[in-house]
């Protein structure tokens, strides 16, 4: 059980495809917490029939341009005309990706800490062998948008999507996402692609965009959070006052607490 989880920002999270995660017992969770971390996030019952408060955003079918609305089809075509979409190497992303990352995060509605260039480069240099990179290039061969994906045996997680805000009006996201969907679902015939779990911070509109434009859907699941004793006490005390707490990190933690089922 322990090798299936890893610590990310003080939380134990599952390392593999969400459809393979199972419910943990309290003793399983405590075993992880004894090794470190502040909490264990456990999701199970992937794509259940019940409309729970928590979900993953996935796409498991691909119908070419025909499945899209007339407006979206035109936007995809414009994007493909304006940009060249292709798989790229880690070296290509290292060369041009950080400037795009900074421009994208500075445009978010909610203040988000941008990683340093050293953190950005270390992430790419130490990425797993399953990591795949995509880029959208303008006619001057400048990177306008990129994606960092984790491609497993039967699924692909779109882990990071960033675009230069100046290129959004030229439909760069439409072209990039359409081509990745086509590649993973039609060409490689994976079970599904996903854009992660329900957004807690809602600092970008990417998930509603994917649902409305590209027919991604909510794959509902159950969420259970197991805390260290002291964090559980803090959460219990603060939760009734969650609407009045200004700190965004604490707000996010309390919001996720309320999504359990």
List each language-model region with its residue ranges.
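A conserved beta-strand-loop-helix scaffold within acyl/acetyltransferase catalytic domains
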Residues: 1-8, 42-49, 61-169, 184
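N-terminal accessory interaction module
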Residues: 1-45
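Acidic-and-aromatic substrate-binding clefts and catalytic sites of carbohydrate-active enzymes
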Residues: 20-23, 93, 197-203
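Aromatic (often tryptophan-rich) hydrophobic motifs at membrane interfaces
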Residues: 130-233
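Well-ordered, non-membrane alpha-helical segments in soluble/globular domains
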Residues: 22-29, 117-119, 173-179
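Active-site/acyl-donor-binding loops of N-acyltransferases
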Residues: 1-5, 45-65, 187-261
